[in-house]
Amino acid sequence: MCIRDRFVYDHPFQWGSKRTGPDLARIGGKYSDSWHYIHLLDPQIVAPGSIMPPYPWIFDHPIQISTTPAKIRAMQTLGVPYPEGFDENANVELKKQADEIVKNLLKDKIEIGSDKEIIALIAYLQRMGKDGRLSKK
C-alpha cells in the first residue's frame, strides 16, 4: 500500500499536526473483532498496563444512520473519494459490515446488536490502513 493511501479519508489533512495516542494507521486486520470489543470495554484485559480508558457508553448507544447520506455528501465536497451515488447505499453497506462483525463476535460468545456504536467503531478500526484504492490506479 502506498503511503498516500493511508490518509485518503483524513479530512482535514492531518500531516504535521500533533498526534496524541497510538498510531492506528495500519491497525486494520491486526486484531480480531473480539479483541477490539474487549479492548474498548476494558483495555487492561488485552493490554496490561494500558493507560487507555474504557469506553462503556459505546456499548449502549445506537448509531445514528439517518444522517449518513448527508455526511457522505459533505465529505465528498471536501474531496473524500466516495463513488458517485454512494450516499444512497451507504447504510446498506454499513448494515452488511455491522452484521459481519456481530457474526464474528458471536463466535466468541459476545452478543450485541448490530446497531451499537461499538460495532461502527470496530468496523472503522478494521478498515484503517486497508484501503488501497489509489494504489490500484
Regions found by a protein language model. Give the residues of each.
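Short, small-residue-biased leader/transition segments that mark boundaries at the very start
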Residues: 1-3
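Surface-exposed acidic, glycine/proline-enriched linker/cap segments
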Residues: 5-16, 99
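C-terminal capping alpha-helices of c-type cytochrome domains
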Residues: 31-137
